[in-house]
């Protein structure tokens, strides 16, 4: 029979305390492992969906609206309309009687029904020859020669429609050069080279310089501006696309880095007349502005991660508070921004209470979030004080998504002069701005090519 060992109370208390510390450390490490293994994905952080390890069973921040799928009551539908002036009419007349077999060729036609088919005719290249004629002045004998249009600068060259179409396919439809070459050959019977397409984009971006500059000036004095950035590769090296946008304008620029120097270079003095919406990246928060608004979509994804993997009560409460603020935003009237209702005051008070908690025992990453929110407390609920300030930066993320799709489809920007990303940024800025203002993209590119 084993003999019971007696230890002093002081030693027992020490072992008990050490055991409790080990349990706490063990739980903390388990929480961190859970975060590192499956915590960061496109739903719970700003990580892109392509980096998700497991893409099944996706959860969304959206909640059911209660509406049925499809068109909603009051929605104006669209369907094919017959033309009153068809370009071609084909008559189908009966030749013999289907009952007795009598020949009906000489019988006049009576009533008829009609059906229409819409198609696109084959597109073939059209060669236009420009001739510069000479005339001798009968008065002084001077030989005068006709002047070619400014854009006709070579013995033979491609026209503006070819240039605009290539730019449309490359920048707006994301196609790589090789596919554009194949499309022109198969659909138009025109054999382009990849070098020709690169030259088209170079000329078009040069012509877009003045519009690009105007967009930058308008963005800097806009009442609300959102900003974001994303990585890309240019000739094998890491670069960054930065975007500044609002409801009417989009300005994109490519840089070799993502520091605050980019903001200083593009927008000296910052946005002192604008409400600035962004994520919590330091260079964005450092940008001078009338007031900042943190992207709540980013914050909600982080809180969802802590709720899902840590079962954090604090994160659940903060997430519920931000969702309540978003619901209140949709219900507020113009007068509510002049005289804040009680609910706005209550939400601000509850936010202060949540940020005043003792977070020393929180998970390390959750602590970092709390500290970040405390530091930027005045930038969390700006949207409840000003009508035109959005609560998220989704507009900037939509602008960035076009760039990510381009790099996914076409790969990196590879140009001998290293300016491919700059050309894309210019032309895409013009395209996105035209779209936001309800203008035809192809017509705008054609106008640039003809200029």
Map each language-model feature to its residues.
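Short, flexible loop/hinge motifs at secondary-structure junctions
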Residues: 1-154, 198, 227, 233
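Catalytic center-proximal scaffold of phosphoryl-transfer enzymes
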Residues: 2, 6, 13, 20, ...
């Amino acid at each position: 029979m084993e003999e019971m060992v007696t230890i002093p109370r002081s030693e027992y208390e020490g072992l008990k305390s050490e055991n409790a510390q080990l349990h706490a450390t063990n739980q903390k490490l388990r929480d961190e492992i859970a975060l590192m293994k499956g915590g960061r994905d496109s739903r719970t952080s700003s990580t892109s969906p392509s980096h998700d390890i497991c893409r099944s069973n996706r959860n969304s921040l959206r909640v059911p609206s209660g509406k049925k799928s499809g068109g909603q009551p009051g929605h104006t539908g669209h369907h094919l309309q017959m033309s009153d002036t068809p370009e071609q009419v084909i008559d189908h007349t009966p030749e013999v009687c289907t009952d007795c077999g009598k020949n009906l060729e000489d019988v006049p036609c009576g009533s008829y029904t009609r059906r229409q088919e819409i198609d696109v005719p084959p597109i073939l290249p059209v060669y236009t020859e420009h001739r510069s004629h000479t005339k001798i002045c009968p008065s002084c004998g001077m030989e005068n020669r006709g002047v070619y249009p400014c854009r006709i600068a070579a013995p033979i060259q491609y026209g503006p429609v070819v240039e605009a179409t290539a730019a449309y396919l490359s920048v707006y439809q994301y196609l790589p050069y090789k596919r554009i070459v194949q499309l022109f050959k198969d659909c138009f019977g025109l054999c382009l080279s990849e070098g020709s397409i690169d030259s088209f984009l170079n000329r078009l971006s040069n012509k877009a310089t003045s519009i690009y500059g105007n967009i930058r000036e308008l963005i800097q004095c806009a009442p609300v501006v959102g900003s974001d950035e994303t990585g890309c590769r240019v000739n094998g090296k890491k670069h960054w696309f930065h975007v500044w946008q609002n409801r009417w304008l989009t300005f994109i620029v490519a840089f070799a880095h993502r520091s605050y120097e980019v903001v200083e270079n593009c927008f000296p003095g910052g946005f002192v007349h604008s409400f600035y919406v962004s994520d919590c990246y330091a260079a964005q928060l450092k940008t001078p502005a009338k007031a900042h608004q943190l992207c709540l979509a980013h914050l909600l994804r982080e809180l969802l991660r802590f709720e899902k993997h840590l079962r954090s009560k604090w994160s659940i409460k903060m997430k519920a508070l931000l969702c309540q603020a978003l619901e209140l935003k949709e219900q507020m009237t113009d007068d509510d921004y002049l005289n804040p209702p009680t609910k706005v005051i209550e939400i601000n008070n509850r936010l202060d209470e949540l940020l005043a908690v003792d977070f020393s025992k929180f998970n390390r990453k959750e602590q970092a979030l709390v500290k970040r929110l405390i530091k930027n407390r005045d930038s969390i609920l700006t949207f409840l004080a000003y009508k035109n300030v959005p609560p998220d930066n989704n507009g900037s993320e939509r602008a960035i998504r076009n760039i990510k799709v381009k790099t996914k489809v076409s790969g990196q920007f590879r140009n001998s002069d290293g300016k491919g990303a700059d050309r894309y940024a210019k032309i895409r800025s013009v395209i996105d701005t035209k779209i936001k203002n309800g203008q035809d993209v192809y017509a705008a590119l054609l106008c640039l090519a003809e200029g």
